[in-house]
């Protein structure tokens, strides 16, 4: 597992977290801790680059959900049928069909936008 970060600028400063390797029960704690450390250091808008992630397990799904909640803060009091619950602070990049399918099947695509490349994700902020 290799995790690196870069800074890019769109309308706001965006931290891109590049993840290389599988996200599963053996790697998720390390991965989540590294990303949470980035948030604790002041990063507010994140792109998780999953283009080099070959496998995303249920542990990885829980991690993404936790990061969504961390960046969202206090949950809104009501459900929003218009999709306003999508995260304005966390975007994903996934070019592998296997990982994209997991995002769709798990329903994470309802709360997290994902893009085909980092440039598109950064430009979405």
Which stretches of residues belong to each language-model region?
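Amphipathic alpha-helical interaction surfaces in cytosolic regulatory modules
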Residues: 25-111
């Amino acid at each position: 597992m290799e995790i690196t970060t870069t800074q890019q600028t769109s309308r706001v400063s965006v931290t891109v977290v590049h993840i290389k390797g599988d996200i599963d029960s053996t790697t998720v704690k390390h991965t989540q801790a590294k990303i949470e450390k980035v948030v604790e250091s002041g990063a507010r808008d994140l792109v998780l680059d999953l283009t080099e992630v070959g496998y995303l397990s249920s542990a990885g799904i829980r991690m993404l959900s936790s990061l969504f909640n961390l960046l969202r803060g206090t949950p809104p009091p009501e459900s929003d049928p218009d999709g306003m619950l999508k995260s304005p602070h966390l975007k994903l990049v996934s070019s592998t069909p296997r990982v994209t399918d997991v995002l769709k099947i798990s329903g994470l695509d309802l709360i997290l936008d994902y893009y085909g490349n980092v440039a598109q994700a950064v430009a979405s902020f």
